[in-house]
Amino acid sequence: MQPLVLLLAFLLPPRAEAGKIIGGHEAKPHSRPYMVFVQILVKETMKMCGGALVREDFVLTAAHCWGSSISVTLGAHNIQKRERTQQVIPVRRAIPHPDFNHNNMSNDIMLLELARKAKQTVAVRPLSLPWSKAQGDSGSPLICKNVIQGIVSYGRTDRTPPAAYTKVSSFLPWIKKTMKSL
């Protein structure tokens, strides 16, 4: 029976989101109100990343998720559909860590200052900061007990281990200083 199910899984047409999360499942709608869809224009090509709302006016993502024009979508469950809970906000300024190295991906962390504050709703809420590589996953948060611990940085293109994360707590002084100064 299992081989038949596996065979059928390969024969079925893939959905748009298929294959991005290995071994995962669809989340309950709006159960992760801090999750952000980041769209980036790079050389006339739209790219996508994930991120986390860490304040009403800031999103935390990976520094390699940079481009000439960036916008974020908050409050989405299905990014393929326009939902009444969605808020699309342009990014005023992208602030990569000053020591980000694109060659070795060290310090791969960036703050996105939003052009306007996100309206907090049941579908949109900031994630707590710790106080005291499938395409599209870059910049997404690694969360433990509702506190952001890491940002997806890079991994193998065949989606097998290892993957690398930027440790958020190592960058708290920079994050706090940057958000306070703007």
Predicted regions and their residues:
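Extracellular "complement/coagulation-type" protease architecture
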Residues: M1-L182
